[in-house]
Amino acid sequence: YFQKKGYDLTKLQGSVNYDPMGKMMVKGKDLSNFITTAKELVEVLAPLPKFRCICVNAIELNNAGSYISQELGYALAWGNEYLSKLVEAGVPAALAAKKIKFNFGISSNYFLEIAKFRAARMLWADIVKEYHPQCNRQPECPNKAEDGTCLCACKMVAHAETSTFNLTLFDAHVNLLRTQTEAMSAALAGVNSITVTPFDKTYETPDDFSERIARNQQLLLKEECHFNKVVDPAAGSYFIENLTISIATQAWELFLKVEDEGGMLEAIKAGKVQEAINASNKARHDSVSKRKEILLGTNQYP
């Protein structure tokens, strides 16, 4: 289709969110033999360097009530599972890594979310480097390391979407405060794209008004706050740098635990991920009921 329209394939950007492991986790479907389809999809879209097709929908964990380090740790194991399976199937590591995209959720924990995205990019780059992706780009790519490693392949493409876990049914306009701060933290963290959930999604199909407000929330950050003009504005902040290291350490420990137990696919098939997230969900609801975790408009300033 793109070729018939005469588009420049090297400039087309987009994604196809193929995530069989996500469906296994959420729906319980056995799609463990996904590698044939995944490999074909990656190879078909190889001429589109900026088009991603393998997706890590970590937002499902966020919306189910996971903690921040949990979401990141499982997301890394999730992405590594796809990457290792593709490489084992004969796909070059650089191509496989460039076709993986991460969809994260954003909670209301402002500074921790900024740190989460910064830690995610750092850890994913470390994981991809272990596969030694080779840069075969012509002419010579300026992002090629001395040992031939393709640094472009090490860059994480992250989409962020405001969480539905903390959206409330009553006094729904307070949801606007939550989604605005969530979008702000993702923008400051330098994600590639953001989706703001309409404030009324908890009780009805979003209408034209709520969808327009959701779009305008992003435009405020771009056109009035100019968050798109600065690269990593949080860099150098001791507090955020310290949080980044802390979250990275916790997430990495979970990642290593999952890998030691056979990888993300085995963890999902055994129900370990689902059990851990359900336990976190229960713990967070208990924390809200006891006012250990603040939910504005519900247990604080109701």
Task: Report the location of each language-model feature.
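Catalytic alpha/beta active-site cores
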Residues: Y1-N109, E113, Q134, P139-E146, ...
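Phosphate/diphosphate-binding loops
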Residues: K27-E43, D171-N175, Q250-K272
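Mobile "lid/hinge" segments at catalytic clefts and subdomain interfaces of large enzymes
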Residues: A38-V42, A46-K85, L177-L254
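Flexible, glycine/threonine-enriched loop-and-boundary segments that flank and lead into catalytic domains
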Residues: S163-A172
